[in-house]
């Protein structure tokens, strides 16, 4: 849901890592914004309301992580003077300061202006759907809204703090349309939603399973709270659908169709069974390797590789989540139950696995036994607290993944530690 300035390849890589590690991704238009030569006539009140046309533009999801949720913008056109501006609330610039602010949960976005033809070229080239919806407002209201957009795009007014769910490139146009639509849009969207914020994130990220699981892991129980359709409009597609139903806009007009892109799932995916199989297989392999490590000369090295891989794959996200809770303002990561399943302690399995690659000793095995026993205990606690009425986090799939890993590895190392023929110290 954002547009960005051109950046060097290395900066793009660093930026992607920052986005990947964040609680939630934000969409991207992958376009730079060039200053327009002249202020539009409506910025000075020179356009007549009868000559103005205001539309919502909805861009469908893209194929990369940063554009999975789609994008929204507002279009103002003076049909007599043949002047147009696309107003995009998704502008930001990649630099080191931005990455630091993003990591701390304080990302500054701004409202930018762009030429319509250039905007259409960029999104069309990406193969994304583009839909126009002309707002059915009076000439006086169109003039007032156009003037407001020009005023909002001034350097002193354009900035805001981005929030993926509460304040983004779709919620800002939603609020503007509702303001000049005399509250009709909010009234239309006041009914309860049948899904949670987590459900929607799962739907939109299903096409990227690794990203989907990471985002699901990083979100806490705040995304389970009851919401209305108004809250769902952090998604551009929801805003477009509800605007059409409100009577505030003409029927949607598709100006570019999506190219070879699967439709967004209507229901959130069900991962519990698949993740349980992955977790059971991972833990089962570890248990089997601990059994072989008793007598097979090369088995401890394989066990060390297993611990290195599991420690990194599970431990790094656990460390990121712990840091987000302790040191940042990513409130959707606070008090996350998933830290009972995976946390910085998991990462300690990686260096201990490296030790096993070169030396089998009781001290290393004792540390791994204590590590996985602790994680097995906290995982069982995470399962048992589900009976409590104030525990609402929907992390069943992650429980299904992590619980068998932690329990089976704890069992394997406990049995291995009891082997009387292991070398010391």
Model regions and ranges:
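Second-shell loop/turn segments in exported
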Residues: 62-63, 127-136, 155-164
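A eukaryotic "domain-start" boundary segment
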Residues: 34-54
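Boundary at the C-terminal end of the N-terminal hydrophobic targeting segment
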Residues: 29-33
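A structural motif
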Residues: 137-150
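Bacterial N-terminal signal peptides that target proteins for export
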Residues: 2-16
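Activation targets extended, charge/polar-rich intrinsically disordered C-terminal tails
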Residues: 151-425
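Bacterial N-terminal signal peptides
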Residues: 15-25
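Glycine-rich catalytic cores of cysteine/serine-nucleophile enzymes that process amide/ester linkages
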Residues: 50-128
